[in-house]
Regions:
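Conserved loop/turn at the beginning of each blade in beta-propeller domains
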Residues: 13, 48, 76-77, 127, ...
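Conserved blade-ending motifs and adjacent loop-strand segments that build the rim/top face
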Residues: 239, 278-292, 325-351
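Beta-propeller and closely related beta-sheet repeat lectin domains
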Residues: 16-20, 77-83, 159-165, 217, ...
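Beta-propeller blade signature
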Residues: 43-63, 102-120, 124-144, 187-226, ...
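A short helix->beta-strand "capping" segment at the edge of beta-propeller domains
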Residues: 1-12, 63-69, 148-150
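Cullin-RING E3 adaptor/co-adaptor recruitment helices
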Residues: 1, 34, 349-440
Length: 440
């Protein structure tokens, strides 16, 4: 399925590092970045953050895209954030704008919620003064508008990006990421919980040192009470990391990758006892280590992993399944070998399909003795493609067969009940669009 079905909007849909979720078989997409189209920036392959005042919806039955505008008090540019959907509400926390990293949360919600307070009493000195508000917009309404929100209790996590989130019992459970702490915060943090990568300093009155690095912290935001908390975890925690992938199965949060390991590691956090478990696997049976990939739950015991940036510096196109009961990886054959992806999204759709959207197809990073070499221009994608993870029902097979062979049934379609006819015609639109793409 190609995003070009949105009339004249194809290039505007190209993006990476966005957030996405599926509601009523409609894919919602917000944020991310793409290659700048300004003449002076095109040659250098400079990326720009996409508009924050719009959200895109794709009807997965017909393949048709629709843009909704979110007006009001629009947030500033934001990348590297973490988005999550709770009861049809999109929450966005952290990330980085043109000024630096953020520890402010933004939510899309219809009710007024409060502004998050930071744990640092001198935040204007510690971190650049940006993204200090929370915002809300009810995306289920025909007209959406950003609204500033106020007052949350508890201690807000330090600024970060490239973190992950599990949604469990209307709570947002964040893990890891890359960000900034004051030297005082670092002194009060276990050395195994924050790895300092570099330091900088600012002088406003007194000299203040800031430490930049990776963490393995767990922070919880309760959406019902608007309260932050930091549970004490037990067991062997993952090493500090970012750009990893997370997924939820029952009461357990799983994460993989994001660390510089030759094989893809996988951990589990029990969200009731807050106990970590690491899966010890034979290296010969595990996928290549990677980051910026996706991990999607497809059953009560299976996790589907796709793509990412390999430890070898190349964008990957492989698909794997991890069975949490047997504790084993299985490499999957699939029809999308021509679609390597990094910084994409992968959502669970109807019939346990994995719906992949966007991302970059050619990110390549290699290190030599002097510098880091990066692919000059990224190819940000706009297509939606689907992985089938189980046999379809007879109804789904018939629906798709009629949609893909509409000429055979052209005279009979009007005989169907109106609701069924409407659904079949959406499938006709979908397969007609596919034929146009294949013959273009």
């Amino acid at each position: 399925m190609d995003a070009g079905r949105a009339d004249g909007a194809g290039s505007r849909l190209e993006r990476s590092s966005h957030t996405a979720f599926i509601r009523n078989n409609t894919l919602f997409v917000w944020g991310g970045y793409q290659v700048s189209r300004l003449p002076e920036q095109v040659e250098a392959g400079q990326d720009v953050v996409l508009p924050r005042d719009e959200i895109w919806l794709c009807d997965l039955d017909s393949g048709m895209w629709q843009q909704k505008t979110i007006s009001g008090d629009v947030p500033s540019d934001l990348s590297g954030f973490c988005g999550a959907n709770v009861n049809d509400t999109l929450y966005v926390f952290g990330g980085c704008d043109s000024a630096g990293y953020s520890n402010q949360e933004r939510r899309i919600i219809s009710d007024l919620v409060s502004c998050l307070q930071t744990s640092c009493t001198n935040q204007d000195v510690c971190f650049p003064p940006f993204l200090k508000k929370m915002f809300s917009a009810d995306v289920s309404q025909p007209c959406c508008s950003w609204t500033r929100l106020t007052d949350a209790k508890g201690t807000t996590p330090s600024p970060r990006n490239e973190h992950s989130c599990w949604v469990h019992r209307e709570r947002l459970i964040y893990f890891g990421g890359y960000g900034c702490k004051t030297i005082g915060e670092v002194r009060n943090t276990l050395s195994s919980s924050f790895i300092v990568e570099e330091m900088s300093w600012a002088t406003i009155g007194d000299t203040l040192f800031r430490c930049w690095g990776w963490n393995n912290e767990v922070h919880v935001f309760d959406t019902r009470s608007s309260t932050w908390s930091k549970p004490e975890t037990q067991g062997p925690a993952p090493a500090p990391r970012g750009s990893h992938a997370g997924a939820l199965l029952g009461n357990k949060g799983y994460l993989s990758g994001g660390a510089e390991t030759a094989e893809l590691d996988i951990f589990c956090l029990d969200l009731e006892s807050w106990t970590w478990t690491q899966f010890d696997l034979l290296p010969s049976c595990a996928p290549l280590g990677r980051s910026m990939h996706t991990m999607t739950p497809t059953s009560d015991s299976n996790l589907f992993v796709y793509g990412g940036l390999g430890i070898d510096g190349n964008t990957l196109n492989d698909a794997w399944q991890f069975n949490t009961r047997r504790r084993e990886w299985v490499k999957l054959t699939h029809p999308h070998k021509d679609k390597p992806r990094v910084c994409h999204t992968a959502c669970l759709g109807k019939d346990d399909d994995v719906v992949v959207f966007g991302g970059s197809s050619n990110l390549c990073i290699h290190m030599d003795l002097v510098s880091v070499l990066r692919s000059p221009v990224q190819n940000h994608c706009r297509d939606v493609f689907i992985f089938q993870t189980r046999p379809y029902s007879l109804y789904r097979l018939c629906e798709d067969f009629i949609g893909g062979n509409s000429e055979l049934f052209r005279l009979q379609l009007d005989w169907l009940p109106s609701k069924l006819c409407s659904k079949i015609r959406k499938r006709v639109e979908f397969f007609s669009a596919m034929k146009l793409v294949l013959t273009a």
